[in-house]
Amino acid sequence: MHIARSLGGNGTHVTVEPRSEHADVGLKNMERARASWQEFPSHHHVHGPIEEVVDEIRTHSEFFDAIILDLPQHPTAINAVASLLGVGGRMACYCPVTSQVELAWEAAEDAGLSVEWAGELMERQWGKASKGGMRPVNGPFGHTAFLLIAQRTSIE
């Protein structure tokens, strides 16, 4: 929904999900957002594994500015959809483990994309210090994601 909000009324937002139970929840949330926001992008949902629905995705736009992949296995998806990115378009991959970051990196390069950044995001709670000011609280750190960001710099 955050992506839809950033696109505003002039954007095109395409979601792809192969699992009906996940799609149903997401689509209900999108409808609630559409009903409560003044501007909402043109939204299209495509059902199926992303590798198998590229032609249907392409019916909504020839090129995309961004693609976000949240999958357990990225290489086949990257290979399938990298051509959907316009020049300057970026792909973000949420990876469950570091070995998947490496495989996503290799797949992105093989697909003609340039890896801009790869790393881990962490959650760290802050609180008031006893003598004033703010500081990280003592305690466990929360892992939020391994990410890889790649960009299409040219169309070959």
Q: Model regions: which residues?
A:
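S-adenosyl-L-methionine
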Residues: 12, 16-74, 130
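C-terminal substrate-binding/active-site "lid" region of AdoMet-derived donor-dependent transferases
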Residues: 75-151
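A short helix->loop->beta-strand "cap" motif at the edges of active sites that frequently abuts
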Residues: 10-11, 89
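Short, hinge-like loop/turn segments at secondary-structure boundaries
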Residues: 9, 32-33, 64, 110-112, ...
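Flexible, glycine-/basic-rich loop-and-beta segments that form/coincide
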Residues: 154-156
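Short alpha-helix immediately C-terminal to the canonical SAM-binding loop
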Residues: 1, 22-24, 101
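Conserved SAM-binding loop of SAM-dependent methyltransferases across substrates and taxa
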Residues: 1-9, 82-83
